[in-house]
Structure formats: C-alpha cells, structure tokens
Swiss-Prot record:
PROSITE patterns: SOMATOTROPIN_1, SOMATOTROPIN_2. Keywords: Disulfide bond, Hormone, Metal-binding, Phosphoprotein, Secreted, Signal, Zinc. It is found in: Secreted. Pfam families: Hormone_1. This is Somatotropin. InterPro entries: 4_helix_cytokine-like_core (IPR009079), Somatotropin (IPR034975), Somatotropin/Prolactin (IPR001400), Somatotropin_CS (IPR018116). One of its GO terms (cellular component) is extracellular space. GO terms for molecular function: growth factor activity; growth hormone receptor binding; hormone activity; metal ion binding. Zn(2+) binds at H46, E199. Plays an important role in growth control. Its major role in stimulating body growth is to stimulate the liver and other tissues to secrete IGF1. It stimulates both the differentiation and proliferation of myoblasts. It also stimulates amino acid uptake and protein synthesis in muscle and other tissues. Belongs to the somatotropin/prolactin family. Disulfide bonds join C79-C190, C207-C215.
C-alpha cells in the first residue's frame, strides 16, 4: 500500500497533466516569447515530476531495495542519450546557446515518443502507469512547444539540425521476466534523467533571457 504522501503527489501530477495544454499549443503563434518559455518550462516540469514518480513506484513495486544501487551501475541503466553532446547540469547548459539547448531538448523528447506511445499496455493496473497515454500526448505537445520556440528564435525559418536516428527500445510487456523488469527499470531511469535535462535546459534559457528573481534552482 502506498503512503498518502506519494499517492497525493502522483494524483497532483496526473491532474496537472489533464490541463488543456492543447489550447495553449494552438495559441502559440499569438503568444509572446516569454509566454512560450513559461509554458514550455511548466510542462517540462510536470512531465519530469511524473517521470520521477513513475520510476519510484516501479522501483518500490518490482526492484528489491538491496539490488537498486548495483543495478543502476550496470549497462542496464545506461542511457544512449548520454552519447550526444548534451550538458549534464545547469553550469554546462549555460555554456550553450538557446538554439543549441532547444535542439538538444528536441532530440531528447523525440527519442521517447515511440517507446511511450504504448506504455499503458505494459502497466495496466496502476494509476500512474495507466496515465502513459496521457504522457505521450503531453510529450507531443512539449515537442510542438519547443518547435514553436525554435521558429521564434530562428525568425520563422528553422534550420536543419542534428537528427537522432536511434530511439529507446520499447518497454517489455512480459513483467514476469527478470530481464524484462530490469529493461523497463533502466528505461524508466533514462526517461527520468532525460526529462530532468530538458527541464533544466528550458529553465536556464528562460532565466537567462528574462532574468527573473526565481531563477535559482
């Protein structure tokens, strides 16, 4: 039985994901640059929180506590996104231009669209896992938001950038297999890490451009 605190957090994350983001996306052309950044940061934050909560619930449910540290130091936990030149934290992100950070964010988002599209078929008996279709929709919306920012910064004529041809594997539906559990555990860990990177990059860009007092994070 989950504690009240984590379940409340998960319910809140799910409620936030149900907000009418598509209305915002449809209004992108008429929005100011500051509003575009504000909305992109907000939804990256929501998705990162849900990714973290999903990872934690999976870990509590399927991975014995004594095995967690050793598993995360194996090839299972390796994220192929680590092979692209993506900053690993705020300080490194500040050395990149806004367009560079947007392109990297787009690569990270697009690498998950395939694996997440059918995630709900894997986790059918959980409140959080069952929201994966919603996560896919919101990830698509965030992709559109990032593309809108790129159009604004490139004066409406986006240039061709790096193409990430490799994507993550699909989640394994055979939850009775130890190999499948380890694979899914590694994928959820990578999803959490990649969403954290995306949120960090967007927050760095927003704070750098608009110098808000709340930029500390």
């Amino acid at each position: 039985m989950m504690a009240a605190g984590p379940r409340t957090s998960l319910l809140l994350a799910f409620a936030l994901l149900c907000l009418p983001w598509t209305q915002v996306v449809g209004a992108f052309p008429a929005m100011s640059l500051s509003s575009l950044f504000a909305n992109a940061v907000l939804w990256a934050q929501h998705l990162h929180q849900l990714a973290a909560d999903t990872f934690k619930e999976f870990e509590r449910t399927y991975i014995p506590e004594g095995q967690r540290y050793s598993i995360q130091n194996t090839q299972v936990a390796f994220c192929f996104s680590e092979t692209i030149p993506a900053p690993t934290g705020k300080n490194e992100a500040q050395q990149k231009s806004d367009l560079e950070l947007l392109r990297i964010s787009l690569l990270l988002i697009q690498s998950w669209l395939g694996p997440l599209q059918f995630l709900s078929r894997v986790f059918t008996n959980s409140l959080v896992f069952g929201t994966s279709d919603r996560v896919y929709e919101k990830l698509k919306d965030l992709e559109e938001g990032i593309l809108a920012l790129m159009r604004e910064l490139e004066d409406g004529t986006p240039r061709a950038g790096q193409i990430l041809k490799q994507t993550y594997d699909k989640f394994d539906t055979n939850m009775r297999s130890d190999d499948a559990l380890l694979k899914n555990y590694g994928l959820l860990s990578c999803f959490r890490k990649d969403l954290h990177k995306t949120e960090t990059y967007l927050r760095v860009m927003k704070c750098r451009r608009f110098g808000e007092a709340s930029c500390a994070f």
